[in-house]
Amino acid sequence: MLKVNNLSKIWKDFKLKNVSFEIDREYCVILGPSGAGKSVLIKCIAGILKPDSGRIILNGEDITNLPPEKRNVGYVPQNYALFPNKNVYKNIAYGLIIKKVNKLEIDRKVKEIAEFLNISHLLNRDVKTLSGGEQQRVALARALILNPSILLLDEPTSAVDIKIKESIISELKKIKHIPVLHITHDLAEARTLGEKVGIFMNGELIAFGDKSILKKPKNKKVAEFLGFNIIDDKAIAPEDVIIKDGNGGEVVNIIDYGKYKKVFVKYNGYIIKAFTERDLNIGDNVGLEFREQTKLT
């Protein structure tokens, strides 16, 4: 179990402000825009940065001031940080070699983790010849082979295309035996992977809970970040807005995604976002119906 208590840190232009949460054997996704403080949080947990105040407790042990190598934390940075002069096998085995594990045990563990992540065919490859997705899997294998108490992932799919991203997410879903803290700005990843979800804004954790917070935000800040329409004290997801015949609204902008369109409708003084397959043009008059609304506090 990971417990973060009142963690604060100022680093360069980024800051954390009294962040507190806990996760057990759950996949936790931390969402937020660039500069929100997500990476500062994960670096503090990994031991790369020392917090200005607060506590980090891992499985009952206070690790706040421990050096990174004594935390039993698996950390995969955004740039993967692989050794370019070593092949895949040696990159994965590196931590075990440093710990002076015997060669037979190293070989067994490397092959086991490589099979788990579907990279057995890459073991003899030079890492410089790997794609971004392959490098990500190697970095993940190098972290998991040390049997960490928690896995920390900093934007693990940010540098790969959509097809590779889907493949990596499929591999991440396999990790069930330890807590995972996954930093991203991708809402789809949070919906797919998150058993717990946190939302960062300006260094503060403004929401934390199960993934239902993505469908029913409790306050305006969270609703705005998630792209909800806000009418008075209610949040309405764009997918819960039905466009129909009528004269209540005027189409003011359209983004065409092929099969469907994202439509912006001026309605009672608000700009309402909706998705539709209807053939519409800017200036068309339409009616709106709202299926589900969440009251904001």
Swiss-Prot record:
Keyword Transcription: no
Main location: membrane
Source organism, top-level taxon: Archaea
Annotated membrane topology: Peripheral membrane protein
Membrane-spanning segments: none
Enzyme category, top tier: translocase
SUPFAM superfamilies: P-loop containing nucleoside triphosphate hydrolases (SSF52540)
Signal sequence coordinates: none
UniProt-annotated binding residues for ATP: G32, P33, S34, G35, A36, G37, K38, S39
Complexes and interactors: The complex is composed of two ATP-binding proteins (WtpC), two transmembrane proteins (WtpB) and a solute-binding protein (WtpA).
Family: Belongs to the ABC transporter superfamily. Sulfate/tungstate importer (TC 3.A.1.6) family.
Entry function: Part of the ABC transporter complex WtpABC involved in molybdate/tungstate import. Responsible for energy coupling to the transport system.
Name of the protein described by the UniProt record: Molybdate/tungstate import ATP-binding protein WtpC
Naturally occurring in which organism (per UniProt): Methanocaldococcus jannaschii (strain ATCC 43067 / DSM 2661 / JAL-1 / JCM 10045 / NBRC 100440) (Methanococcus jannaschii)
